[in-house]
A protein has these predicted regions:
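Polytopic alpha-helical membrane proteins, predominantly small-molecule transporters/carriers
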Residues: 2-440
């Protein structure tokens, strides 16, 4: 009897520990939306004849720089490589996830070309529904959840997709039939991007229920990103003769593309932590609120809706309200004890499959990793860490000195206001992550 009670008590404590990160995950996901929505703003300052492949490659080069810099700043390379050493079986998964991202991003290029951003963006935002499906099938998410919570997640995700459609149509001006001749290919490309971006979260989730730190995962993830984008330029954009390798104008544009990549990395890191603490089904819909923030930058800073009529403005207001309500529904769907038990079972399957220490993995997954890691691994930093940080800062300073911004009307007041939102959201999210998990 005592043994049974002890086992029950342990299971309950484990389930409680697994569910303790919901609030933190919501903060991370909403912060991801803020930063991912702002990531496209610097690229609006790029006015060149470079192909989308070239622009994507340059932006991912900025991503690569930031991907190595931020983990080094927060944890140090000793920690990152020790974590990778404990999870060698996940390195290939991380590279594969990066490749999926790069291919999906390329499909969005074709989707935008063929049907326009207004239609393409809402279509690939259905990746949240793909993610909910994979989360349920592979990781037991929503298994054991109450009907109320299931309804909150599903209806909230659908509301966010519907809001994305409304916000997309609010930006339509002029002839909407310009892309009509390639509509089918554009829709298929956007649907493909949705499928790949929803599937990309499988390696994410698999890594985190194995105890891997998101900072370590993204360090390897970016290798797949950069390698695939480089291969796409070589295969589809002129090979070694591509303009990105030879154009004298490229040095004036790189700062803005690198800056966009850096902003995107901050958002994606928040999204990674959200996936860890919320699961796929809740994290993707909440981070997809990025379209609301992207619209805010376009409308308020760049004046993209300056000539919109009353109907378009009504769509903006209605879409914004629906998206906020959808996010509210998902964020309040706190996992029950039964659902947390399903998560623990998925975690134990990974531990059994790969011979992992279940106690260490549970501690790492719940953000209590520092209690089990060695002090030397946590605190020691090599001299090369400071070299990496200095080199990255030097790259941005050099590119900034050569940057040229085309004449473009911007609302300075809103630029500073939205910039302040970025800083405050990152500070709040970062302080919560540090206080609760020490960035674990």
């Amino acid at each position: 009897m005592d043994t049974k009670e002890t086992m029950t008590g342990t299971a309950n404590r484990d389930a409680e520990l697994l569910g303790s990160g919901h609030g933190l995950g919501v903060v991370c996901a909403l912060t991801a939306g803020v930063w991912l929505g702002a990531a496209e703003a610097p690229t609006k300052l790029v006015n060149s004849g470079l192909s989308p492949y070239a622009i994507s490659l340059c932006m991912v080069a900025g991503v690569f720089t930031a991907r190595w810099t931020v983990p080094t700043l927060l944890k140090g390379t000793r920690y990152v490589f020790a974590d990778l050493g404990r999870n060698k079986h996940l390195i290939l998964n991380a590279i594969l996830a990066g490749m999926l991202w790069a291919v999906a991003n390329t499909l969005t290029v074709f989707a935008i070309r063929d049907v326009g951003l207004t239609i393409a963006f809402p279509l690939w935002n259905t990746n949240s529904l793909v993610g909910i499906l994979w989360g349920r099938l592979l990781f037991g998410e929503l298994k054991g959840a109450s009907a109320k919570n299931v309804a909150k997640v599903l209806l909230g995700a659908l509301a966010i997709v519907a809001a994305a459609v409304m916000l997309g149509f609010s930006t339509i001006h002029g002839d909407s039939s310009a892309h009509g001749g390639r509509a089918l290919s554009g829709v298929l490309a956007a649907a493909g991007a949705s499928l790949l971006w929803g599937t990309m979260y499988i390696p994410y989730r698999k890594a985190y229920i194995s105890g891997m730190n998101p900072l370590s995962f993204v360090t390897v993830f970016t290798v797949g990103e950069l390698g695939t984008c480089f291969a796409l330029v070589l295969a589809l954009d002129g090979g070694t003769k591509a303009a990105v390798f030879h154009s004298p104008e490229i040095k004036h544009l790189l700062f803005w593309l690198f800056l966009g990549g850096f902003v995107w990395v901050i958002g994606d890191l928040c999204q990674q932590f959200a996936t860890k603490y919320l699961g796929i089904g809740r994290a993707i819909p909440l981070s997809n609120t990025n379209q609301l923030w992207g619209l805010a930058w376009g409308a308020l800073v760049f004046g993209e809706l300056a000539h919109a009529n009353a109907a378009h403005r009504l769509l903006v207001v209605a879409g914004s309200v629906v998206m906020i309500l959808g996010a509210l529904a998902v964020s309040t769907a706190i996992a029950s004890e039964r659902e947390n038990v399903s998560t623990k079972q998925a975690l134990e399957r990974e531990c059994s499959r790969y011979g992992l220490d279940s106690a260490r993995v549970l501690a790492a997954y719940s953000g209590a990793e520092d209690r089990t890691a060695t002090r030397g691994e946590q605190d020691a930093r090599g001299w090369w860490d400071y070299v990496i940080l200095a080199a990255a800062a030097g790259v941005f300073v050099y590119l900034g000195m050569n940057a040229q911004a085309p004449p473009l009307t911007m609302n300075a007041a809103w630029l500073w206001a939205l910039g302040a939102v970025l800083v405050v959201s990152a500070a709040v999210c970062g302080s919560r992550l540090w206080k609760v998990t020490r960035f674990s």
